[in-house]
Regions:
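Surface-exposed amphipathic alpha-helical tracts and adjacent flexible/coil segments at the periphery
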Residues: 3-307
Length: 307
């Protein structure tokens, strides 16, 4: 058929990947990011319920919504108690530590899910996988950088899973507790007044960071615009210190506080791509019946590519 590359579905196992890589075609696999709860290309839930087709890049993510579980019986439907309400929400795929197995299996291209993600997230994820690829090419041990993985969690994660490729299933794949950014543990609430929330920190905190205070029913989040230490405004506070923030969100004593964005980390990552040269291009697409799609791109200096 003249096929040069095949993009495998996310439910492919490492054994299937290894088998298919010997068929004379390049193999592309999904290695990181958001997972679909359904078989690839077969989820019609978003299109049916909300008129937005997941197969056309418009998924409204109904799998990230709250659900209840029922068992149908002769007497009617009985609700089944479940841990959490987000029963269809998968964790995020994370295969950095298994990347050597994928590359050894013959994978030619790695796909990272970046839909609706910030450039800082893309910079961090791509740099980590790039370093791992380079180590594999040079026959070195894959990097085990705990700090970078911690930073990645601060940027975005729903919990991590190795995915179907490495036979994860059930609780190893799903996160029914929360469908959004989990962040990392920042500390705990030790006091709540009419005006302020007092927190004991287990990590450093900076003005401009995003936090979430976990609740029994719902969580509440905000940006730390003002940070107080010993009654005085400060720009940052260190692990182990007691600080206060303005009470803009609900909070209760002993509630866990999580950091959902790190302003210092984001600034560091922006610097890694701030000087990247951007080139304006014009794109011309040609589609004719019976012929393939032709894409022609030309930059301001007249250089042109076509495929």
């Amino acid at each position: 058929l003249g096929i040069s590359r095949v993009v495998l579905p996310r439910e492919s196992t490492i054994e299937e990947i290894r088998s298919l890589s010997g068929q004379g075609m390049e193999i592309e696999v999904f290695v990181h990011g958001a997972l679909c709860v359904c078989y690839s290309g077969q989820c019609l839930m978003s299109a049916s319920l909300m008129g937005r087709s997941g197969n056309r890049g418009e998924c409204a993510q109904p799998c990230r919504m709250r659900y209840e579980l029922y068992r149908e019986e002769m007497q009617g439907a009985n609700k089944i108690p479940a841990q959490g309400a987000y029963l269809l929400s998968p964790k995020d795929l994370f295969t950095l530590h298994e990347l050597d197995a994928l590359l050894d299996a013959g994978v030619s291209s790695l796909k990272i899910e970046g839909r609706m993600k910030k450039p800082e997230y893309v910079a961090q994820v791509v740099s980590m996988y790039r370093a791992a690829i380079d180590a594999w090419k040079q026959k070195r041990q894959l990097p085990q950088d705990a700090q970078k993985e911690w930073d990645l969690r601060k940027l975005f994660n729903r919990g991590f899973t190795k995915g179907h490729a490495f036979h994860a299933s059930g609780r190893a794949m799903m996160n029914p507790i929360r469908p959004n950014q989990q962040g990392v543990v920042l500390g705990g609430v030790i006091a709540v007044s009419d005006r302020r929330i007092t927190i004991r920190l287990s990590e450093d905190l900076h003005q401009g960071d995003g936090i979430r205070i976990l609740g029994k029913e719902e969580d509440a989040g905000c940006i730390v615009n003002r940070l107080y230490k010993d009654g005085k405004l400060v720009a940052h506070a260190k692990k182990g210190e007691v600080v206060a923030i303005d009470r803009k969100i609900p909070a209760r004593r002993h509630a866990e506080v999580r950091r959902t964005s790190d302003s210092e980390l984001q600034q560091q990552l922006r610097r890694t791509y701030a000087d990247c040269r951007k080139v304006k291009v014009s794109v011309h697409l040609t589609l004719q019946v019976g012929k393939g799609l032709v894409c022609r791109m030309r930059d301001e200096e007249g250089f042109c590519v076509e495929r």
